[in-house]
């Protein structure tokens, strides 16, 4: 046993930047319904705990307010303008998915106080991002390339996509486990492949979901292979079974000697006293969110699938498995109802659907 332990990387003194997602990914779990005042309260509590980077937007990012992705209680500009001036040490970040968010919206976010942007693409589509990344760099923003659903590309393929993002100007490239599908070996292989092709000064990040309960283990695996940025969400507030629970991950970091600069007890208090009371439902690994991780389905699909299940009479778990089989990706939310309708039709349930609609 001692020989095995001696082979484990010593992470003492390793510096890692924590990036909280509860005010962006957490919007999915709240059906985008977080009031501006509550957004400010949470952000100020995170700032006081020492969290250095906090993401604040609609769940789908800039341009996310739409029929397909849901309408938030306020615009991204309203959220950012309220939160950014209140920050004493934390920087505010935003999510931008090319094709949804625009450069004009990025400029507006910058004007409202955002200083970091996560430019997110599917793991095989980095070539949709060069203009957005270049514009973010022109603005002087901390610019991150974010490769979503990373399990759908092998390590070598993901490394090529990450290299493209670096060439476009990204200062950090993320391995993004949008489905909570990956195991530590999967994460290690992809982070190592990126580290082998990126410049030494280009950082690597990891964004996990807790659908298989692997968020913390996967994040540590990423750090072992050279990642220096880790996303998480206080109390795990996020899509599916939530993101890597940030306060739990921080406790593990403190145990391992990983340096984050964040106060553990303050973050624990934020989770218990601020985030848990605002949850509409307990964010946990349940039957449907576990199915997301097992089948490799985009975590944001969870509540959409539950709504489709109620409408068409097909169990949400079975809808999610079919979405995984079809390899549906982020941005294809409109296909969830189509899939459920097709399944209902095959099972002779459409008469019941019309009766429910009436």
Curated annotation (Swiss-Prot):
The record marks 24 as: Transition state stabilizer. It comes from Methylibium petroleiphilum (strain ATCC BAA-1232 / LMG 22953 / PM1). Residues 16-268 form the Pyruvate carboxyltransferase domain. It catalyses: (S)-4-hydroxy-2-oxopentanoate = acetaldehyde + pyruvate. PROSITE patterns: PYR_CT (PS50991). Its EC number is 4.1.3.39. HAMAP family: HOA (MF_01656). Mn(2+) binds at residues 25, 207, 209. It comes from the Bacteria. This is 4-hydroxy-2-oxovalerate aldolase 2. Substrate binds at residues 24-25, 178, 207, 298. The active site is at residue 28. GO terms for biological process: catabolic process; L-leucine biosynthetic process. InterPro entries: 2-IPM_HCS-like, 4OH_2_O-val_aldolase, Aldolase_TIM, DmpG_comm, DRE_TIM_HOA, PYR_CT. Keywords: Aromatic hydrocarbons catabolism, Lyase, Manganese, Metal-binding. GO terms for molecular function: 2-isopropylmalate synthase activity; 4-hydroxy-2-oxovalerate aldolase activity; manganese ion binding. SUPFAM superfamilies: Aldolase, post-HMGL domain-like. Belongs to the 4-hydroxy-2-oxovalerate aldolase family.
């Amino acid at each position: 046993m001692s020989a095995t332990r001696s082979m484990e990387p010593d992470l003492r003194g390793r510096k890692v930047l924590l990036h909280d997602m509860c005010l962006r990914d957490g919007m999915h779990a709240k059906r985008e319904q977080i009031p501006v005042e509550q957004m400010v309260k949470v952000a100020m509590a995170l700032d006081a705990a020492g969290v250095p980077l906090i993401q604040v937007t609609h769940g789908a990012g800039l341009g996310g307010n739409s029929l397909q992705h849901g309408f938030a209680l306020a615009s991204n500009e309203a959220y950012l303008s309220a939160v950014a001036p209140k920050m004493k040490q934390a920087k505010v970040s935003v999510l931008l998915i090319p094709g949804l968010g625009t450069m004009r919206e990025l400029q507006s976010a910058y004007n409202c106080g955002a200083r970091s942007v996560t430019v997110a693409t599917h793991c095989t589509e980095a070539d949709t991002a060069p203009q957005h990344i270049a514009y973010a760099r022109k603005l002087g923003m901390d610019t991150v390339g974010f490769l979503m659903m990373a399990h759908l590309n092998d390590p070598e393929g993901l490394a090529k996509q990450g290299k493209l993002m670096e060439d476009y100007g990204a200062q950090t490239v993320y391995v993004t486990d949008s489905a909570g599908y990956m195991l530590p070996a999967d994460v290690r292989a992809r982070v190592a492949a990126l580290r082998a092709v990126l410049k030494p000064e280009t950082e690597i990040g990891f964004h996990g979901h807790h659908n298989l309960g692997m968020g913390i283990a996967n994040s540590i695996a990423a750090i072992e292979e050279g990642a220096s940025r880790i996303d998480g969400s206080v109390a795990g507030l996020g899509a599916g079974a939530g993101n890597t629970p940030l306060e739990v991950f921080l406790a593990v970091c403190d145990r391992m000697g990983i340096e984050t600069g964040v106060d553990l007890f303050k973050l624990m208090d934020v989770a218990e006293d601020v985030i848990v009371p605002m949850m509409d439902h307990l964010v946990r690994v349940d039957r449907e969110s576990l199915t997301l991780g097992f089948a490799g389905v985009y975590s944001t699909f969870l509540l959409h699938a539950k709504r489709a299940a109620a409408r068409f009479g097909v169990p949400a778990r079975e809808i999610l498995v079919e979405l995984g089989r079809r390899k549906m990706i982020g941005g294809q939310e409109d296909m969830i109802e189509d899939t459920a309708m097709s399944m209902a039709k095959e099972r002779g349930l459409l008469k019941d659907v019309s009766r429910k609609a009436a």
